[in-house]
Design a protein with these regions (language model features):
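Conserved catalytic or metal-liganding residues and their short signature motifs at active sites
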Residues: 1-196, 201-202, 206-255, 262
Length: 263
C-alpha cells in the first residue's frame, strides 16, 4: 500500500511539475514566427500549429488550459510571435484577436499592376490574384462607371493595413471605398463631374483651370490618370490639363503617350 501511495505521489508531482513547466515557463521563439490560424480551426489544431512554430511547449497543456478557462473563443487570423511569453499570454493574445496586419503603401500614380506588386511584396498573396479582381470585378464600380473595363483609376492611393484573412476582392473593395469617400467630398459624381474636379482631387494645383463641358466619372478619372502619368511635377499639371482640354474642345487628338494605357 505504501509503495502504491509513493508511486501515486510521484505521479502527481510529476504531472504537476510537467504542467508547471509547460504552462508557466516562458518560451522564446527562434526569431520571428508567423502562425496562420484559419477560420474553423479546432482548439486541437490551433495547439498543434503553435507547438510546431515553437511558441508553446506542449499542445496538450494548451488544450487543458483552454478547457479550464471556460473555452474562451480563439480568434482566427495571422499572428506574429517574436517575444518571450508564457502560454497564458499566448492564449490571451488569441482571445483578444491580436492579429498581425500588413502595411501596404500605394503612392499616387501607381497603376493597378503596381498595386498588385505592392500587395504581393507585402506578403498578402499573388499579384496575379489581385489583377484577376482588378481587371474583371467591375461590379465594385458599376454604379459610378458602368462602362469601365477595370478598376484602374478607382483604387485610391493611400497607406492601408490588411490581414491575410482578407480576400483580394476585400482588399480592392477597401481601396474603391476610399475612392468613393474622396469622390463624394469633392463632388465627383456621375452627374456633376467637371474638369475642375481634377483641381479639387489634388492632381492639379489650385489656380486657373480649363473650361469645358461636364464630364462623367469615367472620363474625369481617365483624364486625371493621363495627366498624372504625363508629368510627375504638380506645378506642371495645370498646364498639361489646359492643353489636353483645349485639344478635346477642338476635337484634336490628345497626342499623349499615357493615353495609350487608358485607351
Amino acid at each position: 500500500m505504501r509503495k502504491f501511495l509513493a508511486i501515486l505521489l510521484l505521479a502527481v508531482f510529476g504531472v504537476g511539475g510537467w504542467l508547471a513547466w509547460a504552462l508557466w515557463l516562458p518560451v522564446t521563439p527562434a526569431g520571428q514566427k508567423f502562425v496562420m490560424l484559419r477560420p474553423g480551426y479546432s482548439t486541437r489544431r490551433i495547439a498543434v500549429e503553435l507547438q510546431a512554430a515553437g511558441v508553446i511547449k506542449s499542445r496538450f497543456a494548451f488544450i487543458l488550459w483552454h478547457r479550464f478557462h471556460r473555452r474562451q473563443s480563439l480568434k482566427a487570423g495571422e499572428y506574429l510571435f517574436d517575444k518571450t511569453a508564457r502560454m497564458s499570454e499566448v492564449n490571451d493574445r488569441l482571445v483578444r484577436g491580436d492579429i498581425y496586419v500588413h502595411t501596404v503603401v500605394i503612392p499616387e500614380g501607381f497603376t493597378m499592376f503596381d498595386i498588385a506588386q505592392a500587395i504581393q511584396d507585402a506578403g498578402l498573396g499573388s499579384s496575379q490574384d489581385f489583377l484577376a479582381v482588378a481587371q474583371s470585378d467591375r461590379e465594385l464600380i458599376s454604379d459610378l462607371a458602368p462602362d469601365a473595363r477595370s478598376l484602374e483609376g478607382y483604387l485610391f492611393p493611400n497607406t492601408y493595413e490588411f490581414t491575410r484573412t482578407q480576400s483580394m476582392r476585400d482588399i480592392a473593395a477597401v481601396m474603391v471605398r476610399q475612392f468613393r469617400q474622396v469622390a463624394a467630398q469633392i463632388g465627383l459624381t456621375p452627374t456633376g463631374a467637371t474638369p475642375n474636379s481634377l483641381t479639387t482631387i489634388g492632381l492639379i494645383p489650385n489656380g486657373p483651370t480649363p473650361s469645358g463641358q461636364g464630364m462623367d466619372v469615367q472620363k474625369t478619372v481617365t483624364m486625371a490618370s493621363i495627366i498624372e502619368k504625363e508629368t510627375a511635377v504638380p506645378e506642371e499639371r495645370a498646364v498639361v490639363a489646359s492643353v489636353y482640354y483645349n485639344r478635346l474642345a477642338r476635337k484634336i487628338a490628345l497626342q499623349a503617350d499615357p493615353s495609350v494605357i487608358y485607351a
